[in-house]
Amino acid sequence: MSLEPFSKSEALTFGVELELQLVNRHDYDLASASPDLLRMLKGKEYPGDIKPEITDSMIEISTGICHSHDEALWQLREMRDRMAEAATALNIGICGGGTHPFQQWSQRQISQSPRYQYISDLYGYLAKQFTVFGQHVHIGCPNPDDALYLLHAMSRYVPHFIALAASSPFVQGVDTGFASARMNSVSAFPMSGRAPFVLTWDAFIAYFDKMHATGVIESMKDFYWDIRPKPEFGTIEVRVMDTPLTVERAAAIAAYIQALGRWLLLDRPFMPVEDDYLVYTFNRFQACRFGLAGEYVDPATGNRGALADHILETSKLLSAHAEALSSEGALDMVREVVEARDADAEWIRAAQRETRNLHETVRRGCGRWTQAATQPA
């Protein structure tokens, strides 16, 4: 099949997807509960969409097309609250976090959709190991060439997104030492990593056609890039974030990405070059391993400094754009997280140090996810 045309979308509109954990209330291990939860939600009114994911222990919520931080936050809260009501009736818990701290991948059940069965047949045990939980943010682009510009310009800031959302320090009962261990599961897939450096849609079509001719890929869904174009939506999709522990933080990170996109598209502060990617894997690793305590090499200057400082410096450049988007509060939340080094991975580790029990840590995570909307993130 050929690459579908790039659809028209309103520039800088955005959408948020969150993959969530479903756990039992006995020992807070993952539960194969998505079919039952979806049945409970059938006929209920809520914005956005709620649908199954690759294994039955996961569920995905996604907003509609949003113009503002407040709109996205309202939609996420509404879906969270409807799901919490259904989960209570089923006696299951729902929580955020990029990995479940102690689940065993071999116990997972692949969802029945043909797409997920195909992935399981193709990738074997990697499909079950892909029971990890991410936040994706779509940004509307006025045309396909602008989408590719934004994709590559925004790639410099991938470490920001990883560190701000990092919430997966534990895997199979072990503290990995990573702030975002989830990304290691994604990296195992052959079509993961960064998108090829092409800046025109014609060149991207030529790349896609070559890849399709080899039989390696069938559609854009087969690319697991950190940021990828989504021509059917007229967006780029940022895919590197762990699912935060609250919808408030998820919405703030999405608004940060929207403001960054506005700055990049309107001001065009630099033109991406292929050498930007010389330090890409180093910066990405630093964010995954150390989170907000990581280092960052500026691709433009080669200067090495603190990732947290680079996020704060960037946030100053975004202030006017956040004001134009009515998302100043979200940008302030991002700054507060960075200044306090208050990533969710640190909350999870602190809960584990206090309880010395990962089951109790997950229980507390469920409470954090379903907290009243008036509570801070």
From Swiss-Prot:
Homology family: Belongs to the glutamate--cysteine ligase type 2 family. YbdK subfamily.
Top-rank EC class of the record's enzyme: ligase
Its job: ATP-dependent carboxylate-amine ligase which exhibits weak glutamate--cysteine ligase activity.
Protein's UniProt name: Putative glutamate--cysteine ligase 2
Enzyme Commission number(s) of this protein: 6.3.2.2
Secreted is among the record's keywords: no
Organism: Ralstonia pickettii (strain 12J)
Chemical reaction(s) catalysed: L-cysteine + L-glutamate + ATP = gamma-L-glutamyl-L-cysteine + ADP + phosphate + H(+)
One Pfam family in the UniProt entry: GCS2
Sample GO molecular function, one term: ATP binding
Keyword field contains DNA repair: no
Cystine crosslinks: none
Biological process, per Gene Ontology: modified amino acid biosynthetic process
Keyword terms of this UniProt record: ATP-binding, Ligase, Nucleotide-binding
